[in-house]
Amino acid sequence: MKKNLILFGSFILLTLLTVTAKAQEMDPLLQAKEYFRQLDSICSADNGLLWGVNLYGPVMLVSPADRVIIANRQNKSNTLVEKEGVFIGRLPDNTGIANTAFEWDGELWTMAMWNALSPDDNNARNRLLVHECWHAKQQSVGIMPVMTQNTHLDQEEGNILMRLELMALSRALQAVDLQEIKSYTTDALLLRHYRQALFPNNNENEFERHEGMAEYTGYRLCGMSDLEIRKQLVTDLETYAGKTALANSFAYITGPAYGFTLDRLTTGWIGKVRTGEALPGIAAETSGLTYPPDTLALHVAVSGIVEKYNAGVFVAATKEAFKEEMLETGACYRYDRHYFRI
């Protein structure tokens, strides 16, 4: 009996210790402290090597449900309360909650929503946090924030050409031979150049510098190997290539896709981005691409890419899907004479 009581007591003690350990593990303050430690370590390891500035700064994690803040430092007005090595408070009601960089209490802060941070996937969490930290520093490295002005990517011609570009970028990331990488990169650039000739009132390149470089930086510093990153990007490119709405999101995939392709082709390209150059221009120079002289010649080149990728069925199916969607919504369907007929 005594032996059984000892065993039972040991079981209870073990259970209590396990529950206590799990409770500590799930304590949001301790979690946040660990998240900040990892982020600080990542940014300190880079220490400006990538962009010339250390990306670590004021960071707050916000619970959307109750607007509770857990921050890595005190705010200027000293209104946050220190506890467990972090600072807690409440975000004012007139301040929006998002994954973003914003000015608060006289400082530029990085904000991340608590429920957007994976407790189990360090790489995914750090990628998001680094992405937003980069936004807080982007103007200091010469890149202005912009809103997308690319509604053509949600329309038939623009959408198809963008999705073909994504297919080309996927092939470039998967290629091993240097000439193959350049060839597929050239295909992507020709598709973009043609699309931008058809839709000149776009800011694709500017939006790509804004969101694409944030996402590239998140990937570059999050802790994944280059091979792991390229595999993840290929998977994501396949997902994006199935979307009929890309105006607001394309740069999150094209930016890192071009970035990690350029990493395999050249060095020092980030310095060119900082001085105002766009990724397609840098990639064209690196690949030795000379664009066809006019839209008609571009049309011929793009039609050749469609044939090379056996994408005729994809183009036809996507055109039909857009037509059906327009008919369902009562919109007027228009066939654009500029678009290739295959």
Describe every region a protein language model picked out.
Residues 198-228, 237-293:
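Active-site-proximal alpha-helical
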Residues 24-83, 214:
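N-terminal mature-domain "stem" immediately C-terminal to a signal peptide or N-terminal signal-anchor/transmembrane
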